[in-house]
């Protein structure tokens, strides 16, 4: 399980019912502290339009439902009953299903809050990426509803690589909507608490000073709260000497990871293949390149095209199965690579092509025309393409093409080319709505074709706009699959696609645009959820909402996804033997410098 924000630490039973009935669907659930038995918990589940409350006992040794299976943590109990449908029943035998976790909002939008992170994971992060004084805040796994401040400490010199460096964990209690570290002053928010101890460091009884010098920021966010993260990333630097801030800081950190992705590109560097590359240094990784199998066996370089397979990893990790959708990221065709392009499309059984560039921009060729005129037929080497029809939407042109091998015209395949025409020559679109509507149409088409191969995406170099479109589409697919309350990680997703094709997402503007597009998608989706709830209450049929104000010429919106995630993934348990060095063992040093 990748998140435990189904736990709501500060709500009553009435508030839980209201949340589940207004934001949830049948099968939605949450956990909360028991008001009648302090220390115990309650599982609230929506079923048949009503809410059932189930008591969870915390004996101090284990968690259970007053009988039955016993668990070390609340998270393990919830995960077990999510995975084992039919195990949770009422006295009359009716099954209670836990399908969709209804997540609680993060207690803060600060980037130092890492949410569901174990102690071991925090130590690994702080050791590998932090330095003396680096800190983060996370949810407590042993005490649901509380939090933990994890700080990297070192010797007095603050040498980050010193063998004496360690990580200290301080429990943060949350009681009656106030936060404290087991004694002393209480604070209205986690942010107030952290700011206080940044100025007034805590000191262990052994003398170690817990200096909160610099936050170790997370890039993980709850998709539903992306507006708060965008607001944080958009803040100006606090001081003029602090250049790195927000989007620029995240993107620059991502750029510094490129040295970890120096995979071989020998095939693209071969002398015989150099004229097949639009840009001499933008080459495909060997381990993910598309290998053409139908070439001349006497011509070893006939298997080469500047293209890579991109496989989203979020599904394979959770489901151990082949992803529903994959991509081919490739460059814009050259005159001498058009034949190879169509060989690739045919070989991979690709049925959808996404073109994100004009043929010529600012007087420079970006992609040669690789399709025939409307109602015309043209042969490209061993492949034949027939342009059946073209239709123009506001931002793109849709072409219906028939592809076959020369001499095998009776085995034509339909290939749909979506040509996005309104990406500006400089920068990125001012409104992400047009891109989202475009990707929605592409998604519907791909979904409608049985056993369709990878979606082919290209611009000119096949990395900038191509990477931006693919990353946005992957993130939206995660939200479709897991719901608006799922976790997403923009830099991690970009790093994942960059491990399969070098340089995907080229500029800070493209990086920022990804955030803006996902934010726009979430806002629109939340409006649709609200409208659906209103319509259900009124008994009216639900009306779709478009991502942009421009009327589109084809396709309805996709069915509304569940509000919350379904597939549970394995989670790391907190080490029960881990000792919290809490403020009971510390004293406050107010004037430390």
From Swiss-Prot:
Q: Name one GO biological process term.
A: face morphogenesis
Q: Where is the Tyrosine-protein phosphatase domain?
A: 247-517
Q: What does this protein do?
A: Acts downstream of various receptor and cytoplasmic protein tyrosine kinases to participate in the signal transduction from the cell surface to the nucleus. Positively regulates MAPK signal transduction pathway. Dephosphorylates GAB1, ARHGAP35 and EGFR. Dephosphorylates ROCK2 at 'Tyr-722' resulting in stimulation of its RhoA binding activity. Dephosphorylates CDC73. Dephosphorylates SOX9 on tyrosine residues, leading to inactivate SOX9 and promote ossification. Dephosphorylates tyrosine-phosphorylated NEDD9/CAS-L.
Q: What name goes with this protein? A: Tyrosine-protein phosphatase non-receptor type 11
**From which source organism is this entry?**
Rattus norvegicus
Query: PANTHER family, per this entry?
Result: TYROSINE-PROTEIN PHOSPHATASE NON-RECEPTOR TYPE 11
One Gene Ontology molecular-function label: receptor tyrosine kinase binding
The listed locations are: Cytoplasm
Q: How does activity depend on pH?
A: Optimum pH is 7.0-7.5 (isoform 1). Optimum pH is 8.5 (isoform 2).
State the PROSITE patterns in the record: SH2 (PS50001), TYR_PHOSPHATASE_1 (PS00383), TYR_PHOSPHATASE_2 (PS50056), TYR_PHOSPHATASE_PTP (PS50055)
Phylogenetic lineage: Eukaryota, Metazoa, Chordata, Craniata, Vertebrata
Keyword check for Cytoplasm: yes
